[in-house]
Structures are given as C-alpha cells and as structure tokens.
C-alpha cells in the first residue's frame, strides 16, 4: 500500500501512515452518477393537483344540432365549463402525486460508487478538473491530525485552513457565489455557492461548528459519508481533507465484498 504523510494543524509533518486499499478502487463515473442521482431523486416530494379541480360543476353538453360547439355548458347559460379549453376547467395533463421520481440503486452498487468516489479524491487530475485550487497542497489526499475534530470557532478554522494551504479553494467558493435564476430566490434559497473542501472526520467533536461558516465547506463523520458529498453534481474528485482516524475507519466501512 502507498504511504502518506499526516500533518499537524500548523501544516508540519508528524508521521507517516499507509493508505487503505479503498484508494486503489477503479474510477467508475457511471456508477457514481447513478448513486448521486438516486440520492437527489429520493428527496423529491411528489405533488399534484386536486383530482377534482375544474370538475365541480353540473355543466352538460347541449348535444348536436344547435350550431355551437358540443362542449359542456353551465345550465341556464352558454358558458363553457369542465373541459381543458374552458376558463376554470380541468387541466389536460396535470402532475399526479403517484408519479415515482426516486431512481433506486442496489446496495452493492451504492457501496461501489462510494469506494470509487473516495479513490477519486486521491486523483489530483480529477480534483483539478473540478476547479479546486490545490497548488499549495503538498499531497492529495490530505490527511490531518485528529486534533482538528475539537476546533469549534470560525476564527480557529480560518487560521488552520491557511496553514494547511486550502484557504485558496474556500476563497474560490466564496467568490463564485451567485444569485440563482427562478423563483427559488423568493423561497429562502437565493444563492448558489460552489462546493469547496470536504472535511471527513472520525468523530465530530465541534469541527462542524467551526467550519460551517466557510463558503463551500462541508464536514461529515466517516460513518455518514456518501456519494453526493464526495461527488457533488455527479462529478467526482472533490478536494477532501481526512483526519487520521477517518482514514483508519475507511477500509472497514466500505469493504469490497460487503453487501
């Protein structure tokens, strides 16, 4: 197995560890895409119109022979009703609540996708293709001491990220923040922010509080890691910072023959 350096919070090398075999997994963008889309579609809430909308009327057609279109008309009036082309009528093909949006995926396929996406975080070419700023990083993947798990303030994490050389990527995410198009702006989701570094920890002892105010940064415990965090938008190769304990747990969590 390949060996990799572990860095302190100041950016100094403290020790050397072996990478688990999961980082040698074949890159499978097709499987990764399926896993991410499965997660995205699982969040879609089915919605539809009232099945009786536009149908609450006693309108009936006069029939033929009157020199007028044979559409249902309100009794005592010539006003058309019920049909899609009438004002207040039903919709022709409305959305239905029984539509199935979720694209399911097999458990072993999902595990393969996560393994492949984890391996992609060690591929510098893929990380750069995603647009991450990695010129100051001495190695990919980047492994840091478990001490970072206890950091709880934005001020502390800012200094740590500067010392580690990943602040450039956070600045890129902050500058890339744009106002969305569409009505989402009115519904509490005005901005689109590019994804920055992902911090994978063995145990979250406060780091999520310290890192959450940095643009594009996500923190996840290794037990909860998934394909969408590793490959946002179905594109693998996210800049990922692992703690030493997270690296040690990875091999056991996603074994190759595990169902």
Swiss-Prot record:
One of the primary rRNA binding proteins, this protein initially binds near the 5'-end of the 23S rRNA. It is important during the early stages of 50S assembly. It makes multiple contacts with different domains of the 23S rRNA in the assembled 50S subunit and ribosome. GO terms for biological process: translation. Belongs to the universal ribosomal protein uL4 family. The keyword Repeat does not apply. The lineage of its organism: Archaea, Methanobacteriati, Methanobacteriota, Methanomada group, Methanobacteria. It comes from Methanosphaera stadtmanae (strain ATCC 43021 / DSM 3091 / JCM 11832 / MCB-3). HAMAP family: Ribosomal_uL4_A. Residues 47-67 are annotated as: Disordered. This is Large ribosomal subunit protein uL4. GO terms for molecular function: rRNA binding; structural constituent of ribosome.
């Amino acid at each position: 197995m390949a060996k990799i350096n572990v860095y302190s919070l100041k950016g100094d090398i403290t020790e050397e560890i072996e990478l688990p075999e999961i980082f040698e997994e074949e890159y499978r963008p097709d499987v990764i895409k399926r896993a991410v889309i499965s997660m995205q579609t699982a969040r879609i809430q089915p919605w539809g119109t009232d099945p009786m909308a536009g149908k609450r009327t006693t309108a009936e057609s006069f029939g033929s022979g009157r020199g007028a279109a044979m559409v249902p008309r309100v009794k005592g009036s010539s006003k058309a009703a019920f049909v899609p082309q009438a004002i207040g009528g039903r919709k022709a093909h409305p959305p239905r609540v029984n539509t199935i949006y979720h694209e399911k995926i097999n458990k072993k396929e999902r595990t393969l996708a996560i393994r492949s996406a984890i391996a992609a975080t060690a591929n510098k070419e893929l990380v750069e293709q995603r647009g991450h700023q990695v010129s100051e990083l001495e190695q990919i993947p980047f492994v840091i001491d478990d001490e970072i798990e206890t950091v709880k303030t934005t001020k502390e994490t800012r200094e740590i990220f500067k010392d580690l050389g990943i602040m450039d990527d956070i600045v890129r995410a902050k500058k890339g923040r744009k106002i969305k198009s569409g009505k989402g702006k009115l519904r509490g989701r005005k901005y689109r922010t590019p994804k920055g570094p992902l911090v994978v920890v063995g145990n979250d002892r406060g780091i999520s509080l310290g890192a959450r105010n940095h643009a594009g940064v996500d923190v996840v415990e290794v037990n909860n890691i998934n394909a969408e965090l590793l490959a946002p938008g179905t594109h693998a190769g996210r800049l990922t910072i692992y703690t030493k304990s997270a690296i040690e747990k990875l091999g056991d969590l996603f074994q190759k023959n595990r169902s």
